[in-house]
């Protein structure tokens, strides 16, 4: 359709402009004019411009002065914000839903995250996992005790070798005794180190099942919860960013679980244990230096890590945006190719990568600063405590073995301390990563079923549908359904037609309870759908959608998805009913043929046939058909409709139609207009009604056929016979041309 020209006038007399914009035809636009200025005063005016007829001179002026007009448009675009006025919402349309996840998701406090994680580590319904946790803690205690014994064994070995404090080694006195004691102590030293390592590895082995089970349960709960959220959430989410956040959060679970149970708590315990030993064996000065060093180390680590957290947040944000941009671009591969925008997409993706690179460099440089500060603090503390030990040896209060013991105790803490810094840093970052994961679990769905809701009792014989004064709006103040009432008798075929945005597809979504009407009630078999369980409700409904989206798997999997318990023979049978079986067998891999991302390797007709077949396989009492052939050619549409006729025989069915020729055999046709049922009746009755909206729609779609009939002089029966013969020949030629290629609807 030809583009239309719209004149926008700023209504201030002092400064009046006329801007001519080339805009695609649509219903209406809201235009916010931000450029109206009079004596320094800003005015904002909202106007609605209907795009109707155009003055021919304006159209002519566009072609004669194209360059100047283009410049004016670019200048005007800086001052105008054009927003499509919508009264409905379709998932693949250009409208906007005010459900930004940034506004919906509220962050969960870290304490709540830790509390929730502990409930997975110590589950009430898994005594076997609780036993594993108890055994792991016992092994941890054994590892710490044997670890503390190592410096003492080293001390006793040195003291045995150096029998007199402050003197050189004297091995002439009782050499056999010294050798025996030294050997025993050194063996004890080796056993202590090996025992500590053994306890640690056994602990990791026993606790591994606990950690992996927790990860599995959390990930499954998040996945299931996402499927239980309402459609509004999923229409507003960003798939790339969400998948990145879930992936990072899941990876962080294992680290945080191990860190909390086996690193942070035990390391703090070991710090106080070492300080107590130093106080008891060496005096208060040693304990004070040790506690001071450890406290300074911990405080420095916490403060710097908290400061560094913002760089990790920036890095995660850039990572999310880069992932989302990549997925969005790859999903729209064909569109990118249509407009030769590969370089633009690469540059856009690289822009996000630059942000990630900048944030990552900040994270790396601040990590180097943190590591150096930790090493400096520990080195100062170690030097101070060694000086105190040297003074004690010089004064005769301590032995060389005491010096070795003090050095060993503090050095043994260096590893968990260094790891403590890493653990705290990574735990903080993991908690940030896990925030979205646990926040998703806190998102509450707007569609809820009642407690102990009974299942929907429905059979094909009593499968009635009744809308009772239903009002619904996606956005406040813009009603899509405005008091709709109708009934579909059991076993009847009812069609719903109307213009774009009249609420046809909304009726399907309300039946599935993807949304809840603001007013009114919906009944199936006399039962209010709000009073029955969601699972039983959706089990009773089958749908052939307008856009049949398939899983990235083989054809058999996508067919069997209608009933995952169906046998292969049942799958083959529904494929035959949908006219798909022979075409599949002609494909190189038959039913194992991969359909590609969202089924893009199949034609539109093949995807629709798969959708029909799996709807047949589901075998629901009620079938919904949502404009499934609106984008297909006439022959493919006719073949699909032939498949559908057998399927809906003696079954309650609702056909939402764009092409009226597909619903002429409906028992009743409902015509929606402005959110209400404007007309109802059979096809012929509506055509015979003077001035009916349905007749107007029918005549508009069939104007070419009607004109050709008026100009023809052949008898009606002869013309129909000739047309039928031509149609059959054309269909036969098409089928022969694709024979062997596997495409049943070229």
Curated annotation (Swiss-Prot):
<keyword id="KW-0067">ATP-binding</keyword>
<feature type="topological domain" description="Mitochondrial matrix">
    <location>
        <begin position="424"/>
        <end position="746"/>
    </location>
</feature>
<feature type="topological domain" description="Mitochondrial matrix">
    <location>
        <begin position="200"/>
        <end position="252"/>
    </location>
</feature>
<feature type="transmembrane region" description="Helical">
    <location>
        <begin position="177"/>
        <end position="199"/>
    </location>
</feature>
<feature type="binding site">
    <location>
        <begin position="498"/>
        <end position="505"/>
    </location>
    <ligand>
        <name>ATP</name>
    </ligand>
</feature>
<dbReference type="GO" id="GO:0016226">
    <property type="term" value="P:iron-sulfur cluster assembly"/>
</dbReference>
<dbReference type="InterPro" id="IPR027417">
    <property type="entry name" value="P-loop_NTPase"/>
</dbReference>
<feature type="topological domain" description="Mitochondrial intermembrane">
    <location>
        <begin position="274"/>
        <end position="283"/>
    </location>
</feature>
<keyword id="KW-0496">Mitochondrion</keyword>
<feature type="transit peptide" description="Mitochondrion">
    <location>
        <begin position="1"/>
        <end position="19"/>
    </location>
</feature>
<dbReference type="Pfam" id="PF00005">
    <property type="entry name" value="ABC_tran"/>
</dbReference>
<dbReference type="GO" id="GO:0055085">
    <property type="term" value="P:transmembrane transport"/>
</dbReference>
<feature type="topological domain" description="Mitochondrial matrix">
    <location>
        <begin position="20"/>
        <end position="133"/>
    </location>
</feature>
<feature type="binding site">
    <location>
        <position position="421"/>
    </location>
    <ligand>
        <name>glutathione</name>
    </ligand>
</feature>
<dbReference type="GO" id="GO:0010312">
    <property type="term" value="P:detoxification of zinc ion"/>
</dbReference>
<protein>
    <recommendedName>
        <fullName>Iron-sulfur clusters transporter ABCB7, mitochondrial</fullName>
    </recommendedName>
</protein>
<feature type="transmembrane region" description="Helical">
    <location>
        <begin position="134"/>
        <end position="154"/>
    </location>
</feature>
<keyword id="KW-0812">Transmembrane</keyword>
<keyword id="KW-0999">Mitochondrion inner membrane</keyword>
<feature type="region of interest" description="Disordered">
    <location>
        <begin position="708"/>
        <end position="728"/>
    </location>
</feature>
<dbReference type="GO" id="GO:0140466">
    <property type="term" value="P:iron-sulfur cluster export from the mitochondrion"/>
</dbReference>
<keyword id="KW-0809">Transit peptide</keyword>
<feature type="transmembrane region" description="Helical">
    <location>
        <begin position="284"/>
        <end position="304"/>
    </location>
</feature>
<dbReference type="GO" id="GO:0070455">
    <property type="term" value="P:positive regulation of heme biosynthetic process"/>
</dbReference>
<feature type="transmembrane region" description="Helical">
    <location>
        <begin position="376"/>
        <end position="396"/>
    </location>
</feature>
<dbReference type="GO" id="GO:0005524">
    <property type="term" value="F:ATP binding"/>
</dbReference>
<dbReference type="GO" id="GO:0006879">
    <property type="term" value="P:intracellular iron ion homeostasis"/>
</dbReference>
<dbReference type="GO" id="GO:1990748">
    <property type="term" value="P:cellular detoxification"/>
</dbReference>
<keyword id="KW-0813">Transport</keyword>
<dbReference type="GO" id="GO:0042626">
    <property type="term" value="F:ATPase-coupled transmembrane transporter activity"/>
</dbReference>
<keyword id="KW-0547">Nucleotide-binding</keyword>
<feature type="transmembrane region" description="Helical">
    <location>
        <begin position="253"/>
        <end position="273"/>
    </location>
</feature>
<dbReference type="InterPro" id="IPR036640">
    <property type="entry name" value="ABC1_TM_sf"/>
</dbReference>
<feature type="topological domain" description="Mitochondrial intermembrane">
    <location>
        <begin position="397"/>
        <end position="402"/>
    </location>
</feature>
<dbReference type="InterPro" id="IPR011527">
    <property type="entry name" value="ABC1_TM_dom"/>
</dbReference>
<dbReference type="GO" id="GO:0005743">
    <property type="term" value="C:mitochondrial inner membrane"/>
</dbReference>
<dbReference type="InterPro" id="IPR017871">
    <property type="entry name" value="ABC_transporter-like_CS"/>
</dbReference>
<dbReference type="InterPro" id="IPR003439">
    <property type="entry name" value="ABC_transporter-like_ATP-bd"/>
</dbReference>
<dbReference type="GO" id="GO:0005739">
    <property type="term" value="C:mitochondrion"/>
</dbReference>
<dbReference type="InterPro" id="IPR003593">
    <property type="entry name" value="AAA+_ATPase"/>
</dbReference>
<feature type="topological domain" description="Mitochondrial intermembrane">
    <location>
        <begin position="155"/>
        <end position="176"/>
    </location>
</feature>
<feature type="topological domain" description="Mitochondrial matrix">
    <location>
        <begin position="305"/>
        <end position="375"/>
    </location>
</feature>
């Amino acid at each position: 359709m030809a583009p239309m020209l719209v004149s926008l006038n700023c209504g201030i007399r002092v400064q009046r402009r006329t801007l001519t914009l080339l805009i695609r035809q649509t219903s209406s636009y809201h235009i916010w004019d931000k450029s109206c200025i009079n004596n320094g005063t800003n005015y904002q005016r909202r106007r609605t411009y209907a795009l109707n007829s155009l003055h021919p001179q304006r159209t002519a002026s566009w072609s004669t002065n194209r360059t100047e007009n283009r410049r004016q448009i670019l200048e005007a675009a800086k001052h105008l914000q054009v927003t499509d006025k919508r009264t409905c919402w379709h998932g693949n349309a250009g409208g906007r839903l005010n459900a930004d996840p940034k506004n919906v998701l509220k962050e969960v406090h870290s304490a709540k995250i830790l509390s929730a994680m502990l409930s997975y580590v110590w589950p009430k319904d898994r005594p076997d996992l609780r036993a594993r946790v108890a055994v792991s803690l016992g092994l941890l205690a054994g590892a710490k005790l044997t670890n503390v014994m190592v410096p003492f064994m080293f001390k006793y070995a040195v003291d045995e070798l150096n029998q007199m404090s402050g003197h050189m080694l004297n091995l002439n006195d009782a050499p056999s005794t010294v050798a025996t004691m030294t050997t025993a102590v050194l063996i004890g030293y080796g056993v202590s180190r090996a025992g500590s390592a053994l306890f640690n590895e056994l602990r990791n082995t026993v606790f591994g099942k606990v950690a992996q089970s927790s990860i599995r349960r959390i990930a499954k709960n998040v996945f299931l919860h996402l499927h239980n959220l309402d459609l509004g959430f999923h229409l507003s989410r960003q798939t790339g960013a969400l998948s990145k956040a879930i992936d990072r959060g899941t990876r962080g679970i294992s680290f945080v679980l191990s860190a909390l149970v086996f690193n942070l708590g035990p390391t703090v315990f070991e710090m106080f244990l070492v300080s107590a030993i130093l106080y008891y064996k060496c005096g208060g000065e040693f304990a004070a230096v040790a506690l001071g060093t450890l406290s300074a180390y911990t405080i420095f680590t916490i403060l710097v890590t908290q400061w560094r957290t913002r760089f990790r947040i920036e890095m995660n944000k850039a990572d999310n945006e880069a992932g989302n941009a990549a997925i969005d671009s790859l999903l729209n591969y064909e569109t990118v190719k249509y407009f030769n925008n590969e370089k633009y997409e690469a540059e856009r993706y690289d822009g996000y990568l630059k942000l990630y690179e900048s944030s990552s460099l900040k994270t790396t440089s601040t990590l180097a600063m943190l590591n150096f500060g930790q090493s400096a603090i520990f080195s100062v503390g170690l030097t101070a405590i060694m000086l105190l030990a040297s003074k004690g040896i010089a004064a005769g209060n301590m032995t060389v073995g005491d010096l070795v013991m003090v050095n060993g105790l503090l050095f043994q803490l260096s590893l968990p301390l260094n790891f403590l810094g890493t653990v705290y840093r990574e735990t903080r970052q993991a908690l940030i990563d896990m925030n979205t994961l646990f926040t998703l679990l806190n998102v509450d769905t707007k569609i809820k079923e009642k407690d102990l809701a009974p299942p929907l009792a429905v059979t094909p014989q009593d499968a009635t549908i009744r809308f009772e004064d239903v009002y619904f709006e996606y956005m406040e103040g813009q009603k899509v359904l405005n008091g709709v009432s109708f009934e579909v008798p059991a076993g009847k075929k009812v069609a719903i037609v109307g213009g774009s945005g009249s609420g046809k597809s909304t009726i399907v979504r309300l039946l599935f309870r993807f949304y809840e009407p603001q007013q009114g009630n919906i009944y199936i078999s006399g039962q209010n759908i709000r009073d029955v369980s969601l699972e039983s409700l959706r089990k009773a409904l089958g749908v052939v959608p307008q856009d049949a989206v398939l899983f990235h798997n083989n054809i058999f999997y996508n067919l069997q998805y209608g009933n995952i318990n169906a046998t292969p023979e049942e799958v083959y049978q529904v494929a035959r009913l949908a006219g798909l079986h022979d075409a599949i067998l002609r494909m190189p891999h038959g039913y194992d043929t991969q359909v590609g991302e969202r089924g893009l390797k199949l034609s539109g007709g093949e995807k629709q046939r798969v959708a029909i077949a799996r709807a047949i396989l589901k075998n629901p009492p009620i079938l919904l058909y949502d404009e499934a052939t609106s984008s297909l050619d006439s022959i493919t549409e006719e073949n699909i409709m032939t498949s559908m006729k057998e399927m809906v025989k003696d079954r309650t069915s609702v056909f939402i139609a764009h092409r009226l020729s597909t619903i002429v055999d409906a028992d009743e046709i409902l015509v929606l207009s402005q959110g209400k049922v404007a007309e109802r009746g059979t096809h012929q009755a509506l055509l015979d009604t003077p001035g009916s909206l349905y007749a107007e729609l029918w005549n508009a779609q069939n104007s070419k056929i009607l004109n050709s009939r008026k100009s023809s002089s052949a008898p009606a029966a002869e013309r129909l016979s000739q047309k039928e013969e031509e149609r059959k020949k054309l269909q036969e030629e098409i089928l022969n041309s694709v024979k062997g290629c596997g495409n049943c609807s070229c």
